[in-house]
Every structure is written in C-alpha cells, then in structure tokens.
UniProtKB/Swiss-Prot annotation:
The lineage of its organism: Bacteria, Pseudomonadati, Pseudomonadota, Betaproteobacteria, Burkholderiales. SUPFAM superfamilies: Winged helix' DNA-binding domain. Disulfide bonds: none annotated. It comes from Cupriavidus necator (strain ATCC 17699 / DSM 428 / KCTC 22496 / NCIMB 10442 / H16 / Stanier 337). This is UPF0502 protein H16_B1091. InterPro entries: DUF480, WH-like_DNA-bd_sf, WH_DNA-bd_sf. Residues 1-23 are annotated as: Disordered. Pfam families: DUF480. Belongs to the UPF0502 family. Coiled coil: none annotated.
Amino acid sequence: MQSNHDSDASQAGDRPARPALRPLTPVEGRVLGVLVEKQHTVPDTYPLSLNALASGCNQKTARAPVMNVSEADILEAIDGLKGLSLVFEGSSSRVPRFEHNMQRVLAVPSQSVALLAMLLLRGPQTAAELRLNTARLHGFADISSVEAFLDELASHAPPFVVRLPRAPGARENRWMHLLSGEVSAAADADDADRTTGGATAAPGELEQLRAEQQALTEKVAKLQSLVEHMAGQLGIPVDEFLD
C-alpha cells in the first residue's frame, strides 16, 4: 500500500511551468528558513518579531554557514521577500511581526516546505540527514518518503532542488535547494571540503565523526528549542539566553 507521504509526493504530474522567482540572496534565504523553522519549533512566539528573527538568523547551532547579520540586513531581506509575496507583516500587534507565505507562493505541500527550509538553513544534505533534521518540522515515515518529496521538488519547472553528484568516499548523494540560483559542481566541491576542513579520513571514520557531530547538534537544538519556548512563555527576549 502506498503511504500518504508517497501519494502526496507523486502528484507532480504534468503541471504547468510556474513563473520563476528571482534567486534569493543568502540573507533572504536565511530569513525564510528561520520563519519556517520557528513556526513549528516555537509556535507560541510565531509570527516572529525582528529581535527573534535576528536571533534565529545568527544562532550558532543548526546553521550552515553561521551568519552575523544586522537588523538592518534582515529588514532589507524582508522587504525583498515581501516583494515576492514570500513574507508578510502581521497587523494585529504593536510590535512588527513577520510570517512566511512559502507554501502558497511555491504551491508545494507542507512536507516540501520543511525540506526546503532545512536546506536553506543547513546547506546540502542527504535524504537521511534531512529526515533527521526536519523531525521537529515534519515527521517523515522513512527515508523513502523524504526522497519522494525531494524528487517531486526536483520535477518542478524550474526545479526547486537538485541531487548533487556523490562526493568521493560518500555513501549517499546530497541534495541542495535552487532558491538562490543554480549551483555549480565546483561550488559544491568547495562546500564539501569546508565541511570536512580539507582533512582526509577513512570512510568509516568520517561517517562515525559525522554521526557523532549530528547527535551533538541535535541535542543542542533540542535544548535551544526548550529555552526559546520558556523565554516566550516568560516574555523574555530569547537572545539574552543565546548570546
């Protein structure tokens, strides 16, 4: 029997080509990814204030690359995203708050939005890594479900994601979003080299190191989510805890 995940993802069909969005800037991509992430991880404080959005953009965990952007940079990115209808500002609060409109604009299911957000926040990842990293946004039944949605995203015209060539010594292909434009093989090779710090390691040792790093990252992310939730309940700016 076909799962709901797979049946949803198999509806790519013969859809008409959508109007292409202009490529997002790095800060626009980070802002969009943070809005999607925090919608699920800290729903009590969503839509996000500018301060909370800045904290999410600049946090040191679960981000690749780590950024240090100013509120002025974020406001400029928000203006650009508003022009694409990907972000809008809520009108029910005295403090400006922002939310994304990604699912409607891109016309993709929520599962695909979760995958795109994680690719925006963490860069190229395998389907297995995406299943793990999106756990707080959407619970995929298995890796095959993730791959089905990735294949569907890749089938759009123009595509939203691309499967990258397998890196030397890697067991799986990684996926990368195309919301910031096309990616070159050379650029991906540079990214892979930065990920490993240019070091050479045996495949088994490298896989173990990656697994250990991923486990630590997930623990820190869960603790951060708890802190963000508690700070929201207490009305305390979350950056006081994260600086």
